[in-house]
């Protein structure tokens, strides 16, 4: 479970998947890192969710030497080069070809909502914002009448 309280009192390595999208990442990490006193390892894995979030801050802290973490960046192109599409073809019983691989990759980028979303999802490049949406009703409710 991804509830911070569920980690309390446990031992062992922790993997936090899609960390950038976790609502209580700070509390989850606090509980997870407490396990490191017993030698546990904590792996924080995620697609980016903009630049303004705790996941991206941890990446920056590691890159700038403020934390003793290592950053591993794997783009879609890296995964393809390591055989991702070949594996997909094998598992789904489809024939592999360089042309099919290129068409598959190009289709993922082409069908993303926009270039920034594709770059974030497949290229490990965070968007300038997380894309939070405020409804018109919420905005109008906060406006001061003129």
Regions found by a protein language model. Name each.
Residues 1-34:
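Conserved RecA-like ASCE ATPase "motif II neighborhood" in helicase/translocase motors
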Residues 25-146:
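Non-catalytic, compositionally simple segments
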């Amino acid at each position: 479970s991804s509830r911070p309280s569920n980690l309390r009192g446990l031992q062992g390595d922790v993997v936090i998947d899609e960390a950038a999208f976790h609502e209580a990442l700070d509390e989850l990490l606090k509980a997870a890192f407490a396990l490191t006193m017993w030698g546990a390892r904590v792996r924080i894995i995620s697609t980016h969710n903009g630049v303004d979030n705790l996941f991206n801050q941890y990446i920056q802290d590691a890159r700038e030497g403020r934390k003793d973490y290592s950053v591993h960046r794997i783009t879609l192109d890296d995964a393809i080069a390591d055989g991702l599409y070949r594996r997909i073809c094998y598992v789904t019983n489809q024939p592999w070809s360089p042309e099919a691989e290129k068409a598959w990759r190009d289709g993922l980028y082409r069908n993303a909502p926009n270039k920034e979303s594709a770059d974030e999802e497949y290229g490990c490049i965070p968007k300038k914002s997380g894309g939070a949406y405020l409804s018109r009703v919420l905005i109008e409710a906060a406006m001061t009448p003129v």
